[in-house]
Structures are given as C-alpha cells and as structure tokens.
Amino acid sequence: PARTGRNAIGGMNGLPHFTPKVKRVIYLFQSGGPAQMDMFDYKPALAKRFGEEVPESIYPAERKTTMTSGQKSFPCAPTGLKFSQHGQAGTWLSEPLKHLAKQIDDVCVIKSMFTEAINHDPAATLFQTGSVIPGRPSMGAWVSYGLGSENANLPAFVAMTSNGTAKQGQPLYDRLWGAGFLPGRFQGVKFRGQGDPILDLYNPAGVTRAQRRRMLDALNKLNQDQASRFNDPAIATRIAQYELAFRMQMSVPELIDTKSEPKSVLDMYGPDATKPGRYAYNCLLARRLAERGVRFIQLYHRGWDAHGNAPKGVAAQCRDTDQSTAALLRDLKQRGMLDDTLVVWGGEFGRTIYCQGKLTKQNYGRDHHPNCFTYWLAGGGVKGGITYGETDDYSVNVTEKPVHVHDLQATILHQLGIHHERLTYRYQGRYFRLTDVHGKVVKDVLS
C-alpha cells in the first residue's frame, strides 16, 4: 500500500485530504508544442480550404509571435496527415500515432486545453509551476512536499530529458523541476542522459563504501553542529540529501539497468529502450521508477517546435515517441499498475492553423497557438476511451468545455488525494499554492 501523510517518508500530516485514486504520476511533457490538428483535432472540412486566408473574424484578439506578426498573408494549412478512427468510441488519430491507437480505449483525449502564455519558456513554466514567473515550486515538488516518498532509497520526484532525432529542442531549465521557495529536499532529481545518470554515483577508485560511510558520518556531525548553532533549515536539507545520495549509490545502479528486462519488454518499447537519454529508455525507466515507489516521474521530450516542415517533423517526433508511449501504457496495464498510476501527455501550447512561411501541399510551418490544444490522460480514476471538449472549425478557439492549465493541475492533485486549495506554503507573508487563486477539478473526465 502507498505510504502517505504520517506513514510516508517526509509527507505532511493530514494528507492525503481524501482517498487518492492513484499513488503516482508519470508526466510525459512534449516540449515545443505539438500541433493538435496534425495529431488529434481532426478537421476534414479544412481540406477544401487549403491556401485560403484564415478569416480574421476568428482571430479577434489573437496574439502572434514576432515570427509571424509581420506576415502579410495567413493561408490555411490543413493537415497533410491521414486520420482514422480507433477504439470502441471511434477516437480520431492521425496515421503516425499507430501504436497509441491500440491503447486508445485507456486514454481520455482533452481537445479543449488553453493557456495565456504564447512563448516557450513562460508557457512551460506555467504548466510546471502554475505561474509564468520563474521561482515557484514545480508540480512534482508540491507533490513531494505534500505526500512524501514511498521509498527511502530513491527520490520522491525524478526528472528526465530527451531530444527528438530530427530536431534540436528548446532549452529546459532546472527550475522546471525545482523546489522554488519550498525546502530544497523537495526538488526533482534530474537523471542525466549521458554518462552516469547521477554524478558521483560510484565511489572513486580505492574508496570503499565503509570509508564513504565514515566520511559522511563525520560530515553529518559537523553539519548537525552548525544546525544547532544557526537553526538554518537548509542545513537539515543538506544532511538529508547527503544521506539519500549515499543510499542511491546502492539503489540506482540496479534501477537504470534496463538491459535486465526480458526481451519481450525491450521489444515492446523499441530499439532505443537500452540507450540512456532516449525517450524510449526514459519511458521504460519511468515504469521501473514507478514500481519502486517514486511519487512523481517527469519526462521532457523536445523537438515539437514546428515552425517549418511540420508534416515531416510531426512524423519524426511520433517515430521517436509513439511506440514507447503506448508501450508504457500497455506495460503498466499488464502489471496491474495503470489503475493506480496517472499518465499525462501534452506540451506547453498548440500550433496555428495558418501557415508560417511558404505553403505547399508537402510543406508548411505552424506558429505557437495558446487558444486551444490537446492533452490526454490515462490511468487510475480517468474515463478511458472518451474525447472531452471541442474546438471550432479551424482548431483556433475552444467552443466546448474549456480546460485551463490550472484546471489540469487541480485535477492531477485531486487524483493523488490532494485538494489543490489546501496544499499551501507560507512565503514572504502570504500563502502560495500550485494553482494560485485559480483552478477547478475537471470532474467530467474522472470515473
């Protein structure tokens, strides 16, 4: 059983606020902004409007980035990808999502996401911390602060990054998985994609584990002396982190050895499943972390920023991610873990229906679009096989059941048994929370 509140390691008394639906979250963040109309938001009627000017009437207050604000023409660029229906509910998916199509009955597609941020960094920061202003705690840090850890030998919150094979992605800053003004022990531990996933994972040559233990004991004594003199909570955090690092020297080497998985599992995730730093490897590692009680597992995959050559870009990104994303869902389900895991997929915003740059049948670019885009959820307490929300004929604005960033965050916390208005932290004279003064749980997508 999950250890929460008083029974968890480092959790708050009184949490969870109510019975949780899930024990953990795996958040597959697609950095760069996937194009909703090229993957999920099927608009077949637009094929007849290829090259026509997108009506100004549907962009009454549309902000544009500097990459398209100077364009004289905004021609409609319908998707060049084929769509078909899948699953019992006939969910529309584009051709590159052939693996996800097989798991779609476990997935709730939300077509009506929206945000107010139009550039990558503030938009990603809003999704990860609840604010466009840097410095707030990340969602994983809030969860770690509230619920603590289920495994004393691993962090409660782990972050991993990968990059698309076809395109370099936007920079990702450590503050996206940082603790902000929460105590530092709640920040995410980043597993690196090259070399040892964690620096200093192995002792230097000639240094035994017993010697490391004696050295750490001596250092802890000095730190405890300083803590008693200055009453600085950062010192207690430092002691706890040193101890966790010592335990991770034993737990992490076995964790990251994906080659120990059966061939059938490796084949399911694809050829990159044993290559550190690749998305498939990170998906498999996410399942292994989930098995070992890690509370919040954050993957960032870059390369979705399709300002040009969008059809080939989307296809390449799906080749990198579709098989292993679907494999993660299937793997969790086969092990009986999907029922107590929430899997979240999506980026920081969507893309425009109008073309950025020159438009041809084979090539078009898409600018950033905050007004509507797609996320999906799967796992414990989520209604699988449904599509929630709707957009207009051009996939420009939400027309039914809008879901804001803060609503998504409130819903994720709710599934973990956390009331988003009650998980707070006092800093500089006022109480902060992940959802600020906003957010409502999207109960219609929950079972």
Where are these regions (language model features)?
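Ligand-binding pockets and gating/stacking loops
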Residues: P1-S447
